[in-house]
Amino acid sequence: MKAALKGKYDLDHNSSGAATVAFNAGDVKLRASITDATFKNSPSLTGLVLAVEKPGSFSVDYNVPKKDFRFQFMNTVRVAEKPLNLAYIHSKGDNRTILDGTLVWDPSNKVSANYAVESGNCKLKYSYNHKGLTTIEPTYDVAKNSWDFAVSGKVYGDDSLKASYQTSSKVLGLEWTRNSKQTGCFKVVASVNLAEEKKIPKLSVESTLNFEM
């Protein structure tokens, strides 16, 4: 059985917490997660989500207080001898359906498309990985007719940095992530809206501790 505790804090003095417990039952994984809202005033079902997942095949999430299901089905087919990873995602509560596909041309090059059925919006992304160290990802948003750009890379072993820029909103972002079995995982996110006159940066810190039970 595996468990995880996650905490998040930002400069606006907003804080949140979450806990997840997962264990294997044959070839499927069962998972339960709660948030700090579950115990904010008194113990309740607020924030409780139950899930069952078969990696690479399907996952079903059930939000207990909202009585809302989220389904995801995955499959891989081959196109011109290249793997095409497909996903169908449907959220019952807001009646939202997403179709997602990623064509893995080789270990360094991937092309993906994400289509929202209800809105008709489509995003196209190309991902290039250079020598397993640096990844460059331009994304085109068809509805907004705009581009997003992201560059990420590994530094100092367990650490990685990611810089991003959204041309439609003019938001510049920077992430520092560490994934370590010894010290746990944490992420520092900073962003600034270049379209704002004052350009006040936003900063948040997220930490995750993983346990084997």
Swiss-Prot record:
Present in roots, shoots and leaves. Residues 1, 28-31, 64-69, 103-107, 132-143, 168-169, 212-213 are cytoplasmic. This is Outer envelope pore protein 24, chloroplastic. The chain crosses the membrane at residues 2-11, 18-27, 32-41, 55-63, 70-79, 93-102, 108-117, 122-131, 144-155, 159-167, 170-178, 202-211. The gene is OEP24. The keyword Transport applies. Belongs to the plastid outer envelope porin OEP24 (TC 1.B.28) family. One of its GO terms (biological process) is regulation of monoatomic ion transmembrane transport. Keywords: Chloroplast, Ion transport, Membrane, Plastid, Plastid outer membrane, Porin, Transmembrane, Transmembrane beta strand, Transport. Residues 12-17, 42-54, 80-92, 118-121, 156-158, 179-201 are chloroplast intermembrane. GO terms for cellular component: chloroplast outer membrane; etioplast membrane; pore complex. It is a multi-pass membrane protein. High-conductance voltage-dependent solute channel with a slight selectivity for cations transporting triosephosphates, dicarboxylic acids, ATP, inorganic phosphate (Pi), sugars, and positively or negatively charged amino acids. It is found in: Plastid, Etioplast membrane; Plastid, Chloroplast outer membrane. The keyword Transport applies. GO terms for molecular function: porin activity; voltage-gated monoatomic cation channel activity. InterPro entries: OEP24. Homooligomers form large rather nonselective pores in plastidial outer membranes.
